[in-house]
Swiss-Prot record:
Hormone found in the sinus gland of isopods and decapods which controls the blood sugar level. Has a secretagogue action over the amylase released from the midgut gland. May act as a stress hormone and may be involved in the control of molting and reproduction. This is Crustacean hyperglycemic hormone. Keywords: Amidation, Carbohydrate metabolism, Disulfide bond, Glucose metabolism, Hormone, Neuropeptide, Secreted. It is found in: Secreted. It holds the Pfam family Crust_neurohorm. The keyword Secreted applies.
Amino acid sequence: RIFDTSCKGFYDRGLFAQLDRVCEDCYNLYRKPHVAAECRRDCYTTEVFESCLKDLMMHDFINEYKEMALMVS
């Protein structure tokens, strides 16, 4: 799963892979399918996506990932 059709912005396979990896890792942390789905919802722009970044101890990269999400959304 690399490309989300709800994303209407700039298509970059590398960006999608990085964003999707956060959601995959978050799913692996909690093992609840709704976590991955909510993380990806609205093209990675939900609070769940940001919470996943925090839960994965990626505090230093939150702004960078939010910018990536805006580029593809």
